[in-house]
């Protein structure tokens, strides 16, 4: 459902477990497509949705719950609509602490922490 939300219903992901191998199918408007056929923006949405989907599966299967998600530079490959939809999805998730690492992305509903490095010392500053 994550990819359907990120792509306004155009794409969906299917996870198939064969033995110990997890196969991921990308469906574009009802037809299976290869990942190489995707644009960089579509590829970014597929990657992000796959990460969120696997995290959810692991939470269902695991006895201990993962409540931490770090997304490093995922916003750079998403268009403005994709960024907004991802923030909406993340804000709806329950019991998760999400950190989005980005050099360019800002959102009014997200708290911002600036990290600067001077003389080998990193400083954190919350806004």
Model-derived regions, located:
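Terminal ABC-like ATPase head and other globular end-domains that cap long coiled-coil arms
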Residues: 1-127
């Amino acid at each position: 459902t994550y990819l359907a939300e990120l792509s306004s219903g155009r794409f969906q992901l299917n996870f198939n477990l064969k033995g110990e191998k997890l196969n991921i199918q990308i469906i574009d408007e009802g037809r299976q497509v290869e990942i190489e056929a995707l644009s960089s923006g579509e590829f970014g949405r597929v990657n992000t949705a796959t990460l969120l989907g696997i995290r959810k599966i692991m939470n269902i299967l695991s006895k201990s719950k993962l409540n931490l998600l770090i997304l490093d530079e995922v916003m750079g490959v998403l268009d403005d609509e994709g960024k907004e939809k991802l923030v909406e999805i993340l804000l709806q998730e329950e019991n998760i602490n999400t950190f989005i690492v980005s050099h360019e992305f800002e959102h009014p509903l997200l708290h911002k922490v600036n990290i600067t490095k001077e003389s080998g010392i990193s400083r954190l500053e919350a806004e």
